[in-house]
Amino acid sequence: LKLTMRQIAKLSKKYKIVITHGNGPQVGNLLLQQESCDAVPKMPLEIIGAMTQGQIGYMIESSLDTAFMELGENDQQHFVTLITYVVVDENDPGFQNPTKPIGPFYTEAEAEGLSYTLTKTDKGLRRVVASPKPLAIVEHREIKKLIEMDFIVICCGGGGIPVIRK
C-alpha cells in the first residue's frame, strides 16, 4: 500500500485523483468475527460494508499522509474517505445469484457444514454474497465537488453500499 500511495502522491501533482478499492477479504473477516461471538449483536452486511470502507479508507489516508510527508508536501494535499452508496435495481439477478467473493478460502473439508453460498476458485472454496450492478452513485455531487476542490477522494469501496430507491 505504501508504494502505491507514493506513486499516487506523485501523480496527484498533475492529475485529479479518485481512489476506489475492494473490500472482500475485510468484509469476510468481520463476518467471521461476528459469527465467532454470541455475546455481540450481529451487524447486517451493509453496516459491515460501511465499516470496511472506513477501515480501508483510513489505511489509504494514512499511507497517503506518509507519502506526502516524504515528498515534503504534507500540508499541501488534502484527501478524504467518503462512505458511498450506490443505487441498484431490486430485481437485479445478483440478488438471486451471489457472485462477490468475501472472506477466506476453504478446503472441501472446511466448507462442509457451512451454511454460506460458496463458489469454487483456484485457491479453494470461497463465500459469495450478492453484488447487484450499480446504477448510480448517490454521493456523486459530493464526490465531484471534492474533486473540484483538489481533494484526493477515496470512495465506492467494495463497489459501494447497495441501496434500492423507489
Name every feature range the model reports, one short phrase each:
Residues 37-153:
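Ligand-binding beta-strand-loop-alpha-helix segment within the catalytic cores
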Residues 23-43:
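A short glycine/small-residue-enriched secondary-structure motif
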Residues 6-9, 21, 25, 29, ...:
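N-terminal, well-ordered alpha-helical segments
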Residues 136-137, 152-166:
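Conserved mixed alpha/beta catalytic, RNA-binding, or beta-rich assembly cores of soluble enzyme
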Residues 29-33, 91-97, 165-166:
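Short acidic, glycine/serine/threonine-rich loops at helix termini
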Residues 16-29, 78-83, 153-156:
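Short beta-strand segments at enzyme active-site cores
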Residues 24-28, 87-90, 161-163:
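Short, active-site-adjacent cap segments at secondary-structure transitions
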Residues 1-20, 30-35, 145-148:
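N-terminal glycine-/serine-/threonine-rich phosphate-binding loop
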